Amino acid sequence: MLRARRLGKTIPDYALTTCQHAIAGRSLLLDFDRSFGSTWRPCPRLEHLSREESSPGGGSFRTDLAVEAHEVLRQSMGPEIPGVNTRTDETDFGSITRVAVTTEQAARALGKAMGNYITIDAPELPLRDRELEREVSQALARELVGLIRANLNNADFWAIPNFTTLICGLGNWNATPDAIGPLVAGKVMVTRHVYSMTPPEKRGGLKSAAAISPGVLGLTGIETAEVILGVVGRVRPNLVIVVDALAARSVSRLGTTIQLGDTGIQPGSGVGNRRFGITRETLGVPVIAVGVPTVVHAMTIVADALSIMGQAPQGISPEQQGGPHGIRDIAGGSELPPAVSQMLEPYLGTLIITPKEVDVLAKELSDVVAGGINYALHPAIDEEEIYQYLQ
């Protein structure tokens, strides 16, 4: 019998309609039956937002990466998906993949909002090569500038007087895999407090920038979107950049991938703890999201292991493998069958995995992301000066 206790009082089952346990200290959200007379109401500008989206293809795996959702969908719908345009460019450090979701039908199938998503893949990024990190930061800056201009009707934001950017580092700074956002917020070059006092001829390539790390609901008792909405109303920025940790479907993407998008972000969605959205509709200004995958769901690892077990070496028949037919059948698809998922759900349903060196990854990746944002917003600053600032 599910019960919740507060101040020594017991709340019976029938009154408890939702109980979402936090991952990494996010929150414990209790929605009570109307008979208890709850008077809480969300912010009016946030009421229309949906709390949950289906995973691509109706599968059981969550991913925040549009490129992974597209890969899963292609396996069930074929290589050409109406309303989804993709392009991959090879680079010296890896690749850059662009996914454009152009129709509502494609957005529902993909489980992603309509818009543009850019994925930067650098498989050797965890090796802590400084030159490689600078290359990725510069690539991130170029893509970020392109997204900003596209969302400002191709306007040159560097030439707009008093153009102000608010950088929001989302996440729980007490949980290392979720600390990417706060770390980045502490490393970007903030200039808003001195920009207005600097003579125009001495501003050079600096733009007005401010940063905030609003924390999470479990730490502050305030929705992240509500904090940012209040700051936006006071600071009145022209652009908001949100940085957050993401959940991936593939272990190989942990610490090697950076995603940009112009659709905003749903904090906590990757670990099943979706909060109110931070989007252009809620804030009234363009919102660019930058995310780095740091966790993967345990169910994904199980599926990958079964897939490896089901792959027969070339020239050996399935019967000679010695494995049960069930495993080979399971390994035939990219996701676990519903029966297997239901069997594992009590044990692995909410379990997420992160690398043991995630503290090092978080520090290095926050340097890369902060460096890219600094490059994009302050083009006249010398490269060496930017990296000295990050030290």
Regions found by a protein language model. Name each.
Residues 212-213, 242-390:
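A structural signal for small-residue-enriched, beta-sheet-centric alpha/beta enzyme cores
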Residues 119-123, 164-174, 211-215:
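Short glycine-rich or small-residue beta-strand-to-loop segments that form or flank ligand, phosphate
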Residues 172-207, 211:
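Glycine-rich phosphate/diphosphate-binding loop of Rossmann-like nucleotide-binding domains
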Residues 170-178, 218, 245-249:
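Gly/Ser/Thr-rich loops at beta-strand to alpha-helix junctions
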Residues 204-231:
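A structural-propensity feature for long, helix-poor, extended segments
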Residues 104-152:
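An N-terminal, well-structured beta->alpha segment
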Residues 19, 29-111:
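N-terminal amphipathic/basic leader segments beginning at the initiator methionine
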